[in-house]
Amino acid sequence: MFPGRMNPKMMRQMQKMMSDMGMDSKDIKVLKITMELEDKIMVFEKPKVQVMDVMGNKTYTITGRAKNIKKDDIKAEQKEQIKDEEVKLDITKEDIEMVVNQCEVSEEEAKKVLEECNGDIAEAILKLSQ
């Protein structure tokens, strides 16, 4: 889109324009990503992940090299290990505060509903509003 490098002033202007349009972007630290497809498993070690929030909808961009593993090549115990790896849900204080402010509930209740909704703020607010 832009040939060469962007100077810092252009970058700030672009970020301000995105913010004005309701878009927010940030990098998150990720150690490992595993994607299970029909015929293989893709493992990204130390990928770069960027989260773009556009009016409440989050889009994740993954950059890095994937290690492709054919499902036929994986031993049964490795399959179980991959399936049993628990994904820890990261619910931030800001997410909890947003639900508390929108629904006028306690922080404990907001956190519980966010966990039930897998961290989806909009779904949690809708659930508490009913």
From Swiss-Prot:
Sorted UniProt keywords: Protein transport, RNA-binding, Transport
Recorded GO MF terms: RNA binding
This protein's record includes keyword Cell inner membrane: no
Entry-linked InterPro entries: NAC-like_UBA (IPR044034), NAC_A/B_dom_sf (IPR038187), NAC_arc (IPR005231), Nas_poly-pep-assoc_cplx_dom (IPR002715), UBA-like_sf (IPR009060)
Ranges of residues in domain NAC-A/B: 8-75
Gene3D superfamilies: DNA helicase RuvA subunit, C-terminal domain (1.10.8.10), Nascent polypeptide-associated complex domain (2.20.70.30)
Keyword RNA-binding set for record: yes
SUPFAM superfamilies: UBA-like (SSF46934)
GO terms (BP aspect): protein transport
Cysteine disulfide partners in this protein: none
Purpose: Contacts the emerging nascent chain on the ribosome.
Subunit record text: Homodimer. Interacts with the ribosome. Binds ribosomal RNA.
Similarity remark: Belongs to the NAC-alpha family.
Protein name: Nascent polypeptide-associated complex protein
Species of provenance: Methanococcus aeolicus (strain ATCC BAA-1280 / DSM 17508 / OCM 812 / Nankai-3)
